Amino acid sequence: YARLSKSERLQRVLKLLKDRKWHSTRKIINQAHVCAVNSIAAELRMNGYAVECKRVGDVWRYRLGG
């Protein structure tokens, strides 16, 4: 997995999630310019961040917990 200190893509997503609000997969893709949000969430967890996810209808949402 990628280390946060060496991954701009993880840093961009973490910056977005730091407001602790729920963000849809689409919003994260568009605002952080990434893909595979579920993989990024897993990598952030491996870096010690409590990323939560939930499904609302057909939309997955993510936020920084803890």
Which role fits each region the language model picked out?
Residues 4, 31-32:
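Residue-level marker of alpha-helix boundaries and capping positions
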Residues 1-7, 41-66:
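DNA-binding patch around the recognition helix
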Residues 22-31:
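Short acidic, hydrophobic short linear motifs in intrinsically disordered regions
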Residues 7-22:
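Short amphipathic alpha-helical interface segments
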Residues 34-39:
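Short, basic interhelical loop/turn and adjoining N-cap
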